[in-house]
Amino acid sequence: MSLNVVMGNGQHDLRSEMLTMIQQQFCQNELLTVFYIVPNHVKFDSEVNVLQRFSIMNGNDDSELYAQSRLQVYSLTRLAWALMKNTPDRQPDIVEPTGLFMIVSNILREQSDNLPVFSRMQTKSGFVSALVAQLVELRASNVTPENLLEVLEKSADNIFLRQTLNAKLHDLAIVADDFNARMGENQITGQETLIAFAKQLADLKLSNVAFYFDGFNGFTSAEMMVVNQLITTYPVTMGILGDPEKMGQQREGDVFFKPMTTVEQLSITARTAQQEVAITAATKMRPLSRTAQQVLGAWACLGEYRNFTGSRDEVHLNVFAAENPITEIKEVARRIRRSLVDDPTLHLRDIIILSRDLTPYQAHIEAVMSQFELPYFLDMDVNMMNHPLVELILNLLAPNKFQYQTMLAILKTGLLRPTFENKIVSHDEFFDIVSHMDNYLYAYRPYESRWRDFSRPFKLFQVTRDDDDTEISEDEKVNNRLEYLRHFIVEAFDELDDGFAMAKNLRQSVTHLVLWLQKYHVTDALLEQRDDFIAQGNLSRSQQSEEVWQMLTKTLDEMVEIDGERSVSLTDIVTTLQAGLSGAKFSGIPNNLDQLMISEAGIVQNTQYKQLYFIGGTRQNLPAQVKNAALINDAERSIVQPALQSGTNPRYLQNTAQQQMAEENLLFYGSLMSSIGSITLSYPILEPSGQLAEMSPFFKRLVDTFNSEVEVIGSIPSSAASLLKQYVGTARATLSDLVKILPVYGQTAAFKAVQNVISNTMQDRLERVLSAPNYQNNTTKLKPEFISALFGERLNVSISQLESYYSNPFAYFLQYGLKLQERATNELNVAQTGTLYHAVFENVLHELIVKNKSLRDITGDELRALVRQHMQSQLALPAFEILNDSGKMRATTNYLTRVCETLVLNLQAAARENTSKPEAVEQLFGFSKESLPPLSFARMQVRGKLDRFDKQDVNGEFGTIIDYKSNGKTFNWGQAYDGLQMQLLTYWDAAQQSAEKLGVAAIGGAFFAKISPEKTKITDKTDLNALFTGKLIPETFKYRGLFISEPAYVSALTTLEPQEKSAHYPVVLLKNGALGKIGVDAVDPDEFALLLQRNRENIITAGDLILSGYFPIMPVEGGLTYSPYLDIIRFDRALGDAYKVQSPADKNTIIKLLKGGQD
């Protein structure tokens, strides 16, 4: 028996050396079986390569099929399974992460009085998982807390560190002892599989076998135990990186320090077992290109900060710096496309893209590779926590399943679907109704009580049916399907919750969950998803459905086995499931045999690729900045590790961050080894964070050594010639770069040449894309047939619609022409509270009108009672049902009632200033026959509604219009002139033409009444003590608007003495008894006539423009502030869009304009 080590650098073909030795041994011993051990990650590729090369070595053609039973390729874990499969009764049970989490959680709960350190720490998120990981690491390293305490007692390191570690180890020892006792002899963690295998190897008697190890640079503690056991019993041969002439002289920081130290440790083991040790230098060379050979040779020196003395001739190390990560990955894809064209023998499977960290690229890889039509395999772990099944279960176990976000998360998994005729509803049909349910839930946000109140159906659409209707409308069908889905959800949730409530322990809870998933066809939906992915050719995604179900059931089984008889809460179940599934990963399966490999440098790769692209080589990423988050931190590890690693039985904890970073030079060397051909290094100049990035020092050493030119790749070609030379890829990818240089180089020959080639495959797309730079954000006039279809031949509009046209013409087209609307929402906002106040005021005043009373004629208490009465009647309506849904909303209702009382009392106070009396509320004009006539024009008529109409004096000489507003709106002369504020003037005009019907001779004024209280901010200059004690005096209510400056009307509004101002009306008398100007909303009758005429002209102009199809993108400044159409309008002043010029707000200036227009 012996330990044979074949040692060489990355230029040597260690595999060929060992296969030659195997061939010789086969000739010498016809009964010999060789177990060829490789790292697990490259097991399949290595098996194919080993057998192919061995076949050729034995004289077979490389195209012939070859089988060999005496040469078997395994990973260590597969070897353990192969050798131990015939002794299942001796194999310990493996406890999965879920079980470990439960065991440790139970220990912490039961031992809390004995764990002073851990009792404080376990309240921190993730502590239990960190403790589990630490216990697993100690067991896998064959180290106990007692071992660490012994080392600590002998240490002379930092006293404070020793004290803190001692306290931590004290608690860890208690937990570990209890943990080991509960695990017993027949249970192990997944990381201890190889340790168990190593122990059983001692009893295993194999004859005529030999073991070969290939591709390892070092071993974990568990792997080392297996290797040591094999060395003591069987012949072992190992191919490993290193320099045999420097054995024993290696130092930390050397590129080959780790593998050579590993050989040194194995040699001690072999000699202790009386085995021969032979370390030989490899002589066979890999078929490397000149570049790959010299780069490997250079890094062996440069990685140790030694000068490279080898030849630099004919080394073509490609290096480029890209503007950003997206440009970088696009450039790599472009170069790969070019390589495939230049070399017909090159396949995608011959190319690998590596990065130390793929995170900055992960979100862009799919889009870029699709654009360049490159099939690829992303060799990264995919976490099971993001799978729809896990998402479904965790949300089903959440306490508030009926909340909007949780409900949508459940429905959008597509796994919980109702059935129809014993079949689950199809995917498309289900998601169609889910989209409607989404709209309903978003609009109304129903509480759980509302979900369960089936007497109040879910209605997304309000449908009115005539008695003679025989067909159900589409809107009604949607409402019916919503109700069906609602009943299904409530029934399913209730059955789930009832089963959990009846369960007496964890076993019954888990059993109920699985049976519920089967009863409600979640398993069937999961199988349907799998089949759909198979049909799409996505084998990787299809297997995930099976893997996640297997992992879930395995996790649940583990939970029941360990703690099945204990009574647990749903919170405990969720926490345990999250712990068990958080580390679960899907096994990646390539969808194609020929595809590009994209992986990270920290993962073992095969060494047969013809091209290597190492991306993301910035100072920040390479060498990697490692952080250790283990329970025993790096400083504490540095105290105990030297003693653990010494002696004849060395043991190893996880390396510290510093030790891991010291191995980065070896990791980079292994990455360079993956290519036998070309090597391309790249990095982004700009990090995703926006910060400038520097080239990695690893890259820089190679670049400086070989004087490599660093090509700078911008996101935009610098010229047409540059496009032709550097940016040509697929037609689609090239087109995206072509359009970027169109404005400058569109007429050059190179540009035309590329354009002509693209036009052969995608002419329509080419024309559309190349026209993009000439795009102007302008609209064109609608065709007459479209105008007629959208607006009819004659307009029938409200004045607020015309105001919106002047504010933003294109938004008017979107809202009233195309009928585009935001998603409805039933949230309590300013608009909705304003509507509520408005409705209460209307009903209160209507009751007073019926009783022929005014606000002055009743007491404050009577008025409050009226407000409360009509508030209750409004709350019974569907529009305000949200205010009855919860205690919080009922408290809000009480607040709104008090506010409403205050506002009505404000109106009462103003009414006491004169003898006015409300005559009508919600007075319509331009609607039904009972309403007042509309304002009619040649091609349109204007309709509207007067919130309140008062008879201002007892003789009925004057009438006053009141319009309720949530904000403190005032009359703006400039906006009235521009058509932006036409409401008061139009209402005045409509009321004046129907003055006789309204019972007055003329309209004297129109005012805005603010019906929302002003909010006081803490930042406002105010008395904070009064604010916090509720004694802050509220603002004084005041009407603002416009009135005729006739003395009779002014006297009807208020009775004032000279130098006095009205408390509630915009009226001030000067010393001489005349009307003042500041704070007075008066207008001369002649000037008012001009203003009214301008208003009519604005109405006619707006109607003519609308019916001519003129909807320019020319909003007034502020017209886009609350617009829901910003994403459609795309207004951008930097790109030439302009606001409409507004007139000044000054009254005198506008009057001059009005008189000038008249002249």
Curated annotation (Swiss-Prot):
Entry keyword DNA-binding:
yes
One molecular function GO term is: helicase activity
Q: Provide the E.C. number(s) assigned to this enzyme.
A: 3.1.-.-
Q: Which cofactor does it need?
A: Mg(2+)
Q: Which InterPro entries match?
A: ADDB_N (IPR049035), DNA_helicase_suRexB (IPR014141), P-loop_NTPase (IPR027417), PDDEXK-like_dom_sf (IPR011604), PDDEXK_AddAB-type (IPR038726)
Q: Which UniProt keywords apply?
A: ATP-binding, DNA damage, DNA repair, DNA-binding, Exonuclease, Helicase, Hydrolase, Nuclease, Nucleotide-binding
Q: Top EC class per UniProt?
A: hydrolase
Q: Does the keyword rRNA-binding apply?
A: no
Recorded protein name is: ATP-dependent helicase/deoxyribonuclease subunit B
Give the gene that encodes this protein: rexB
